[in-house]
């Protein structure tokens, strides 16, 4: 399990004339802690994964195995050894200190619920990175990952000075595709056989967001604006429902968050 989680964030663009970030770069710091709130006010924290997270990590992964495994990266080498949790934490820390990644644990109100990892960080003329994430089903639909992504993007663009964020998603992962589109990520096309997922090389749709796409707005403000617009739309739809008779179905329920992740 540990090896599969680690490899999930290993792939990314590497063919551009650029250089990796380092701890000497302005704004690049590790360990790093980022905090934010979902539009509903839930506290979300991004921080380094530590050895103390081992029991919670294992518990969450085990409880969500059936939900996560269709999207988990695997090794094309069936004999590749899995990493221990300690080795995973050590590799994450080494990658972060080398400026290659920002591998965050995601907490909701102090409880470990998943990971968001920034990988393939390059500067120079490219100034780009890739982002991957997973989250417990127990917090799906509460805008935990969109909030985590927004807080991280504001740090990457505003503090680290990156220009482009890329996210690659399997075409079958309709929930994540919907999130990318609602958040305004630009779909850049299909990457055939891009990552080894669930035992085979799988196609991925590539999405990207650049500083220009935000139009001077922070990502956090964009998320709050979109969430507010969704609430207004649902309220308007509800108010337009005619008064139900006994033989009619009543107004539709809210059905969860407007952004389905």
Language-model region placement:
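Short amphipathic alpha-helical segments enriched in hydrophobics
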Residues: 61-65, 72, 96
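Acyl-donor (CoA/ACP) binding surface of acyl/acetyltransferases
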Residues: 1-56, 60-67, 103-261
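Generic, well-ordered alpha-helical segments
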Residues: 49, 60, 77-84, 98
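Solvent-exposed, charged/polar functional surfaces in cytosolic regulatory/catalytic domains
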Residues: 67, 87, 91, 95, ...
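A short helix-loop-beta-strand connector motif used in the catalytic cores of GNAT acetyltransferases and
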Residues: 77, 90-105
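Conserved GNAT-fold acetyl-CoA-binding loop/helix
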Residues: 69-90
């Amino acid at each position: 399990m540990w090896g599969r989680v680690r490899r999930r964030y290993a792939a990314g663009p590497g063919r551009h004339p650029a250089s990796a970030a380092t701890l000497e770069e302005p704004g690049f710091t590790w360990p790093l802690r980022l905090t934010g709130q979902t539009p509903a006010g839930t506290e979300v924290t991004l921080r380094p994964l530590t050895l103390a997270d081992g029991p919670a990590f294992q518990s969450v992964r085990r409880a969500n195995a059936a939900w996560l495994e269709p999207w988990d990266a695997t090794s094309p080498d069936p004999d590749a050894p899995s990493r221990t949790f300690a080795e995973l934490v050590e590799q994450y820390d080494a990658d972060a200190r080398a400026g290659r990644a920002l591998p965050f644990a995601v907490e909701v109100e102090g409880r470990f619920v998943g990971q968001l990892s920034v990988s393939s960080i390059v500067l120079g003329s490219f100034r780009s990175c890739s982002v991957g994430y997973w989250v417990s089903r127990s917090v799906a639909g509460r805008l935990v990952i969109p909030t985590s992504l927004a807080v991280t993007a504001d740090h990457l663009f505003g503090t680290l000075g990156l220009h482009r964020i890329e996210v690659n998603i399997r075409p079958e992962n309709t929930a994540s595709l919907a999130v990318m589109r609602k958040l305004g990520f630009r779909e850049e096309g299909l990457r055939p056989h891009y990552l080894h997922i669930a035992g085979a090389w799988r196609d991925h749709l590539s999405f990207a967001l650049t500083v220009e796409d935000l139009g001077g707005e922070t990502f956090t403000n964009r998320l709050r604006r979109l969430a507010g617009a969704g609430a207004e739309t649902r309220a308007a739809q509800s108010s337009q429902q005619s008064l139900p008779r006994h033989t009619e179905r009543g107004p539709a329920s809210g059905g969860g968050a407007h952004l389905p992740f």
